[in-house]
Amino acid sequence: WKIEMNAAPRSPLSRQQMAVLMAMLVALMPFSVDAYLPAIPEMAQGLKADIHLIEQSLSTFMFGVAVGQVVGGSVSDIKGRRPVALVGLAVYLVSVLLLSMAQTGGQLLLLRMVQAFGAGMTVVVVGALVRDYYEGREAAQMFALIGIIMMAVPLVAPMLGAELQKLGGWRAIFVFLLAYAVLLLGLMAGFLPKPAKTEKIGRDIFAVVAGRFKRVLQTRAAMGYLFFQAFSFSSMFVFLTESSFVYMKLY
């Protein structure tokens, strides 16, 4: 087996351009979650499904993201960040294309999970890419730039989704996500260079990955942060799941 070293080739992009590209990759998540929230009631009617079944697509999406990040993070250490991101985007692209043609609530749930798996594989490499290409203060500045750009996405996504719904119904939202994925795939393929160096590891890669997860699980501070973040996400998604339906019924 080979595992990618931290020493990656210098990116052909400037620091600002790299920050925008990384932010666009991370934005895949909030766009995928927030853009279709205003359309949940219409989706339930169009698919002739119970509203609560459509709401479950948020839960299935987060499950798929979790699995995609675990798989993508581990594989990216072996095969490199670029191929994992490209494969993740390809999976995302195909699933969104099929989502735009979904006919039942069951198809929606299944395809949302596949979409989330691709999104998880893609997004998980962002932090690693920044650490690969930048060090010290420069890396901190990159993360700050990405954070600034990312702050606007959860605000814009629901409004964008509502406008797309007015123009072409709820399926137009997934057509937009398809176009966005195609754009990202082209940018990643064209501007993210292949890793310059690899190193061999002399033991079973699965044992190496399992050992890393074991160290994380045995670190008390890390587990505290994980549980805190999990409960924060739980509260947020309870609100996201119910809010659009309540607002549209009351206002």
Predicted regions, residues:
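Short hydrophobic/alpha-helical segments at membrane-entry points of transmembrane helices
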Residues: 106-112, 224-225
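Central cavity-lining transmembrane alpha-helices of secondary-active solute carriers
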Residues: 59-72, 127
